[in-house]
Amino acid sequence: MSCVNIRGCRIGEGRPKVILPIVERTEAAILEKAAQFSTLSADCVEWRADWFEGFQSPAAIARCVQKLRVTLRDKLLLVTFRTKAEGGEQALSHKEYLAFLRLILDTDCADLLDIEFFTAGADLPALIEQAHSAGVAVVCSSHDFAKTPPRAELVSRMVQMQQAEADLPKLAGMPRCRTDVLELLAATVEMADLHPETPVITMSMGALGAVSRLAGEAFGSAMTFANPGQASAPGQVSLDIVNEVLDALHL
C-alpha cells in the first residue's frame, strides 16, 4: 500500500493513524476542545463543521478554522461537512456544499478535506484538483447508515474514488449481521492487495462493527476515529482503548 505523507505523518504506513472528531456547536467550545486534543496521543483532529452553529456564515467558518489551525499546533486538521444525507447534522444544497469546500481551501488551514463522493457528484474530479492545487489532501467519503453494500460494490466505489485522484478513499457501512462486517473487511483487504495506489479508510459502524476500527493495520485501513468523550458516529471506541489495542495488534 502506498502512503500519504502530510507534514511527516505517513498515512498508510505502520499503525493506523488516529483521528479525534470535534462536534461542538460554538466557536468557544470548538477551540476549547481543540486545545485539549492538541495534547492527546492522536495524529489528526477532524472538525465536523456541520455541528457548528455558524455553518451558514462564511466569515464565521473562516475565522473558526483559522483559530483551529493555530490551536491544534502540530496535529493534522481534517475539515468535514457531513451532510444530512450521509448522517450529518445539516442539509446543504449542492451549490452551498461546493461553496463550503472552496471556502475551506481558500483559508489555507486544512491539511485534509473531506469530500463526499455522492454529494460532489460530477464535480468531484474538479474539486479534488482544486484541493491539490491548494496543497490539501482529499478524503473522499461515502457512508451508508442503513446497510453494508456487497464487497464488489464497496471495492468499485473506492476504485472510482481513486480514479478521481482522491488521496484517501473512505467508506463506512452499517452492519446488519456479522457477515456484513466480514464483507467490509474483505473489501478493505482487496483494496490493499489489488488496488494499492492509495491508502483507504474503512469502518463498519455500530457496536457490531467496532472490531473494524481496531484491526485496520491487519486488514488495510490506514486511519481510525476514536471517541475522546463525545462520539461523532456509532461504534467509535474510546481513545485510550484504541491506542492500547492498536499497539497490541501492531505488526
Q: Residue ranges of each PLM-predicted region?
A:
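Catalytic alpha/beta core domains of metabolic enzymes, predominantly
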Residues: 102, 112, 117-251
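Short boundary motifs at domain starts and secondary-structure transition points
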Residues: 7-13
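Short beta-strand/loop segment at the start of cytosolic alpha/beta domains
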Residues: 1-7
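Active-site beta->alpha loop and helix N-cap motifs at the rims of alpha/beta catalytic domains
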Residues: 3, 14-133, 143-148
